[in-house]
Amino acid sequence: GGFSEEFNPGMASDPDFNMKLWNKGIRIFKGINDFKVYHFSSTTTRKKINFKRNKGDITFIKKWGFSHKFFKKYYLRSKSLYIEPLKEPDKNLFYYFDLFLCKLKIIFLIFLTRR
């Protein structure tokens, strides 16, 4: 499928969709470098009564095992110019250290939800 309901109304839904594409073997991601999106004062969510904002960053890390920032940095390389289809990330010391921090966050989140 496309966008997941668990990220509605859109917090971290784009990285989640990109992760689905990555897992299907898609390696061409253009237009994800530094860009700005204007939401015009949250007109979509502001009108809803009893609106509850989702915690997309937490949902993403529980679903995929690492943060959306980690995915964008090591997989999508969102700070780099597009040259060719992406390859698997370089799994160096920085990669494993950041992945370790993501795993610690998951453990912390599990601990908090059991209280």
What is each PLM-predicted segment?
Residues I28-F29, T43-R115:
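C-terminal, non-catalytic tails of nucleotide-sugar-dependent glycosyltransferases
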Residues Y38-H39:
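Histidine-centered active-site/metal-ligand motif
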